[in-house]
């Protein structure tokens, strides 16, 4: 169910070895303070993922956020709860000032998650990301964490 919203992935990505390589890459980025990879849990199940990426320090103090949920865990507010908790950590623990997100124009569910978490729409970026095999426009959102 994520294929319309995700980059085209190699078959290797969906293997145990591919996921191990991805996990190692994410942990290496975390060690460099440029990413915070997280999982969303529902009881004892992994329900999805939440990634803070492209963390930039200095005068910018900003990052990108992305998230996904397994089909069986959508529509119950899990993404909103997880995103809200991450935003609190971004402000209180990581010292970030701003978090940005991008969604495909037709991804209204994700846009609702962002709006509920206090993000504001800041514009549309043409040909922003290569999703499902083609460059596609995205709606950009931001959340300013400090007054």
Sequence positions of predicted segments:
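Conserved catalytic-core motifs of GNAT/GCN5-like acyltransferases
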Residues: 100-102, 120-137
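Conserved active-site tyrosine of GNAT-family acetyltransferases
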Residues: 114, 119, 141
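Conserved acetyl-CoA-binding loop-helix of GNAT-fold acetyltransferases
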Residues: 67-69, 75-89, 108-116
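A contiguous pocket-lining binding segment that forms or flanks enzyme active sites
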Residues: 83, 95-102
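Hydrophobic pocket-lining residues that define ligand/cofactor binding sites across diverse proteins
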Residues: 90-94
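Conserved G/P- and acidic residue-centered "switch" motifs that form tight phosphate/ATP-binding loops
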Residues: 44, 77, 107, 133
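GNAT-family acyltransferases
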Residues: 1-72, 135-136, 140-147
């Amino acid at each position: 169910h994520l294929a319309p919203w995700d980059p085209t992935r190699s078959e290797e990505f969906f293997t145990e070895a591919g996921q191990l390589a991805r996990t190692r890459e994410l942990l290496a980025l975390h060690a460099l303070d440029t990413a915070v990879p997280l999982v969303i849990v529902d009881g004892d199940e992994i329900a999805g993922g939440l990634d803070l990426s492209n963390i930039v320090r200095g005068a910018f103090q900003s990052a990108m956020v992305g998230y996904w949920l397994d089909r069986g865990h959508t529509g119950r507010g899990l993404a909103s709860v997880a995103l809200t908790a991450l935003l609190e950590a971004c402000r209180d623990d990581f010292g970030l000032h701003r978090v940005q997100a991008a969604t495909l124009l037709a991804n209204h569910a994700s846009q609702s998650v962002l709006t509920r978490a206090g993000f504001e729409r800041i514009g549309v970026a043409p040909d922003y990301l290569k999703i499902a095999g083609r460059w596609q426009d995205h709606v950009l959102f931001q959340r300013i964490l400090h007054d």
